[in-house]
Amino acid sequence: MLAKRIIPCLDVRNGQVVKGVQFRNHEIIGDIVPLAQRYAQEGADELVFYDITASSDGRVVDKSWVSRVAEVIDIPFCVAGGIKSVEEAGQILSFGADKISINSPALADPELITRLADRYGVQCIVVGIDTWHDAATGRYHVNQYTGDETRTKVTTWETLDWVEEVQKRGAGEIVLNMMNQDGVRNGYDLHQLNLVRDVCNVPLIASGGAGTMEHFLDAFQTAHVDGALAASVFHKQIINIGELKQYLKQQGVEIRVC
């Protein structure tokens, strides 16, 4: 069995790490490189960096900090933000990123997933899905341009359909960003994760809602995800990654402990 992964998420805006609640009202957390170093030293399995306004601003992720991160950490990291071409992805990988993630650009051009997978291999291609639960209808819908709350829009895709579509097109991994849970720290949406797990045959990463060590355990044992991504509990030092991994190991989760 492959070890489960603990993945800190660093949302980047204007060269700094920020964090919001339900993708809104972002506050500055700190500088990119020191935070990346800290998480690597604490025992993170990999890092994810989202340049959250790149797509809504119509630009690609700022590459200047990608190479600086690559110089100071020795764990894999994934970069996302406005990547719309094979060439842009190649630049980010050449700067030292191990994976690239696409979200809004994939919704605008689904064939982009295939072009990237064909060029760089599915192991490098992550698709992020920003999913919102509509309580009135009980449905889960995919949102686009979520980095800018003035431009965020609900797409015509229902979440499960889009999960199946991106796999057909070559996604090597899926990060499910559950917007209702984002930043509120009351647990991952296990019901939604189980629905997605049933149709997801590639590694699935849960994102949005972690507030306690038990929430990570629930995601692994109840929803059988491959990795758990979190931000505010790590940024605010509510949970230490090393202590979290020791706890998970004690609970029988297969995980790498430093």
UniProtKB/Swiss-Prot annotation:
Q: Where is the active site?
A: 11, 130
Query: Pfam families attached here?
Result: His_biosynth
Lyase recorded as keyword = yes
Q: Which SUPFAM superfamilies match?
A: Ribulose-phoshate binding barrel
> Is Lyase one of the keywords UniProt gives this record?
yes
Involved pathway(s): Amino-acid biosynthesis; L-histidine biosynthesis; L-histidine from 5-phospho-alpha-D-ribose 1-diphosphate: step 5/9
Query: So what EC number does this one have?
Result: 4.3.2.10
Tell me where on the tree of life, at the top rank, the source sits: Bacteria
User: Reaction catalysed by this chain?
Assistant: 5-[(5-phospho-1-deoxy-D-ribulos-1-ylimino)methylamino]-1-(5-phospho-beta-D-ribosyl)imidazole-4-carboxamide + L-glutamine = D-erythro-1-(imidazol-4-yl)glycerol 3-phosphate + 5-amino-1-(5-phospho-beta-D-ribosyl)imidazole-4-carboxamide + L-glutamate + H(+)
Instruction: Cite the GO molecular-function annotations of the record.
Output: imidazoleglycerol-phosphate synthase activity; lyase activity
Assembly and interaction partners: Heterodimer of HisH and HisF.
Family per similarity comment: Belongs to the HisA/HisF family.
Protein's UniProt name: Imidazole glycerol phosphate synthase subunit HisF
Q: Which organism's genome codes for this protein?
A: Pectobacterium atrosepticum (strain SCRI 1043 / ATCC BAA-672)
Corresponding gene? Answer: hisF
